[in-house]
Swiss-Prot record:
Family assignment from sequence similarity: Belongs to the universal ribosomal protein uL10 family.
Pfam short name (any one): RL10P_insert
Keywords in alphabetical order: Ribonucleoprotein, Ribosomal protein, RNA-binding, rRNA-binding
Keyword Oxidoreductase among record annotations: no
InterPro entries: Ribosomal_protein_uL10, Ribosomal_uL10, Ribosomal_uL10-like_insert, Ribosomal_uL10-like_insert_sf, Ribosomal_uL10-like_sf, Ribosomal_uL10_arc
GO-annotated molecular function: large ribosomal subunit rRNA binding; structural constituent of ribosome
Annotated protein name in UniProt: Large ribosomal subunit protein uL10
Task performed by this protein: Forms part of the ribosomal stalk, playing a central role in the interaction of the ribosome with GTP-bound translation factors.
Gene expressing this chain: rpl10
Subunit structure: Part of the 50S ribosomal subunit. Forms part of the ribosomal stalk which helps the ribosome interact with GTP-bound translation factors. Forms a heptameric L10(L12)2(L12)2(L12)2 complex, where L10 forms an elongated spine to which the L12 dimers bind in a sequential fashion.
Amino acid sequence: MAHVAEWKKKEVQELHDLIKGYEVVGIANLADIPARQLQKMRQTLRDSALIRMSKKTLISLALEKAGRELENVDSLSDYMEGQPALIFTDMNPFKLFKILEDSKTPAPAKPGAIAPDDIVVPKGDTGFAPGPILGELQQIGIPAKIEKGKIVVSNDHVVVKAGEEIPPKVAGILTRLDIQPLEVGIDLRAAYENQTVYTADVLTIDEEKTLSDIQKAFSQAFNLSVNAVIYTRETMPAIIQKAASKSFNLAYNASILTSETTDLLLAKAYAQMLALAAAAAEINDEAVDDELKEKLSSRAAAPAPEEKEEEVEEEAEEEEEEEEEDAAAGLGALFG
């Protein structure tokens, strides 16, 4: 039986204890990270996370050992690549991923490296005077030409598609054009929390879209709650306001006197009285006394009482239609 070095046993045990001691364990790739940037990242995470580099075999053994007590944690071994490291933290794995992604910096193209996204040479002046580089640009498919004594690119051109290797010639041209298509930083491949492993694609969140989706869901839930008269802290004011509006419209159109409707009903009755007097005066001028004639001649132009009632009724009908539409929208969104 081969002898196992004591330091290896100690390393596996220490890694095992760290895995068990933190809520979140991440597996990262530190390949090609400059020492200065790695040191800076360690300092940034000093109070919230621990980065521990080790050999692949020792990390695998530690994860396997911890997997006997923590379900599924050993599956992190499947995501080891490059120069592996374990990251231990108690912060949310999505927050950890965002911190690491935000810390990445642009880097020049390297021959053989995989393009993370489409690499585009943009339209415009390259800054180069006419010379051999024109042929080199055209050789790799870039639509370059001479214009006003400068080499310009006619239109945006994709030289390497996402997921493809960067050819040596393309890498050289990109460097000369000062295009840095790669990123250097701690590459978190997966994170373990509460028996669940989150891969990088899951941890990648479009914050603007997520916020927009949450706002939309809240708005739809709010509309449904208001129209279904479900009382919550957020909907109570709207439900009460809606009930008050309906009560007011009912009281007004049914001529029920309240502190809110009395003034309007008196104004309505007064307008109706003047309209009746005007109609009577047209038939028989003597049917209206001098006081009423004076009021008729001085009254301001105003809508007829019937029109007022119709307006209130129309507003109520419009409100009902809007509420039905909002309720339908809310139900449709929640139940597909």
